[in-house]
Structure formats: structure tokens, C-alpha cells
Swiss-Prot record:
The keyword Transmembrane applies. It comes from the Viruses. This is Small hydrophobic protein. It is a single-pass membrane protein.
């Protein structure tokens, strides 16, 4: 029994660590992509607005 117990505990710890890392990575990735997409959208809107104004004249 003691031979089986430590590996299970270790695997559980590893799984928890992996889960934490994945959630952190996904959260940071989503935050970064959201910020960049918002920035790009605002830039695109601004340039598009300028282009439409220029071409209307």
C-alpha cells in the first residue's frame, strides 16, 4: 500500500499544478488577445473613418 500511495499523491499534485498552469496560461492569453483585439479594432475603426472622410471629399 505505501508503494502505491506516494505515486498517486504525486500524480494528483502534478495534475493540480498542470491545471493551475493551464488555467493561468489560458487566462493570460485571453486577456492579452482581448486587449490587442480591442486596440486593433479601435485602430481599424479610426483608419476606416479617416479613409471614408477622405474619400467623401
Amino acid at each position: 500500500m505505501p508503494l502505491i500511495q506516494p505515486p498517486l499523491y504525486l500524480t494528483f499534485l502534478l495534475l493540480m499544478l498542470l491545471y493551475r498552469i493551464i488555467t493561468l496560461y489560458v487566462w493570460s492569453l485571453s486577456t492579452i488577445t482581448y486587449k490587442t483585439s480591442v486596440r486593433h479594432a479601435s485602430l481599424y475603426q479610426r483608419s476606416f473613418f479617416r479613409w471614408s472622410v477622405d474619400h467623401s471629399l
